[in-house]
């Protein structure tokens, strides 16, 4: 007959092992994914509205913008997704600021990666 200390040790070990097994399986189990999908599906999808362009386009430029079908779309993936659509006139007006912003963001990420290595 095993001693009471051995029985208690085995019982404690089996309880800890069961807790560890349940913690790992609950995170990876398909049931957990289904619960997450239900929680996400209850939220209505967010609809983004573009900002008003009041004052950004001068009245003399409106004929040029209406006739221009050229649109520029910039997309890149970093730790987050970014997408920007601009007409030709908007790109001409805000292109330098946009370029500087993108350069600052991308170089900052590159500097952080180099510092981590």
Curated annotation (Swiss-Prot):
Q: Which residues form the propeptide?
A: 52-75, 99-117
Q: Where is the signal peptide?
A: 1-23
Instruction: Give the Gene Ontology MF terms in alphabetical order.
Output: ghrelin receptor binding; growth hormone-releasing hormone activity; hormone activity
Which positions are lipidated as O-decanoyl serine? 26
Q: What are the lipidation residues for O-octanoyl serine?
A: 26
**Which positions bear Leucine amide?**
98
Name the InterPro entries for this protein. Answer: Motilin_assoc (IPR006737), Motilin_ghrelin (IPR006738), Preproghrelin (IPR005441)
- Presence of the UniProt keyword Signal in the record: yes
Give the location in the cell: Secreted
What does UniProt give as GO cellular component? extracellular space
What does the PTM comment state?
O-octanoylated by GOAT/MBOAT4. O-octanoylation or O-decanoylation is essential for ghrelin activity. The O-decanoylated forms Ghrelin-27-C10 and Ghrelin-28-C10 differ in the length of the carbon backbone of the carboxylic acid bound to Ser-26. A small fraction of ghrelin, ghrelin-27-C10:1, ghrelin-27-C10:2, ghrelin-28-C8:1, ghrelin-28-C10:1, and ghrelin-28-C10:2, may be modified with singly or doubly unsaturated carboxylic acids.
Q: Where is this region: Disordered?
A: 29-52
**Bias-annotated ranges (Basic and acidic residues):** 31-43
Keywords (A to Z) from UniProt: Amidation, Hormone, Lipoprotein, Secreted, Signal
GO biological process entries: dendrite development; gastric acid secretion; negative regulation of inflammatory response; negative regulation of insulin secretion; positive regulation of cytosolic calcium ion concentration; positive regulation of growth hormone secretion; positive regulation of insulin secretion; positive regulation of response to food
Name what induces it: 2.5-fold increase in plasma level of ghrelin upon fasting.
Answer yes or no on keyword Repeat.
Answer: no
Lipid addition (O-hexanoyl serine) is recorded at 26
Report the sequence similarity comment from the record: Belongs to the motilin family.
What PANTHER family does the database record attribute to this sequence? Answer: APPETITE-REGULATING HORMONE, GHRELIN PRECURSOR
Under what name is this protein listed? Answer: Appetite-regulating hormone
């Amino acid at each position: 007959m095993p001693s009471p200390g051995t029985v208690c040790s085995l019982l404690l070990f089996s309880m800890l092992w069961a807790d560890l097994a349940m913690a790992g399986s609950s995170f990876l189990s398909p049931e957990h994914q289904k619960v997450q999908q239900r929680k996400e599906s209850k939220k209505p999808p967010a609809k983004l509205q573009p900002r008003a362009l009041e004052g950004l386009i001068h009245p003399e430029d409106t004929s040029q913008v209406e006739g221009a079908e050229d649109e520029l779309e910039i997309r890149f993936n970093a730790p987050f997704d970014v997408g920007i659509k601009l007409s030709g006139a908007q790109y001409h007006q805000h292109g330098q600021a946009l370029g500087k912003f993108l350069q600052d963001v991308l170089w900052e990420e590159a500097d952080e990666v180099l510092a981590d290595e």
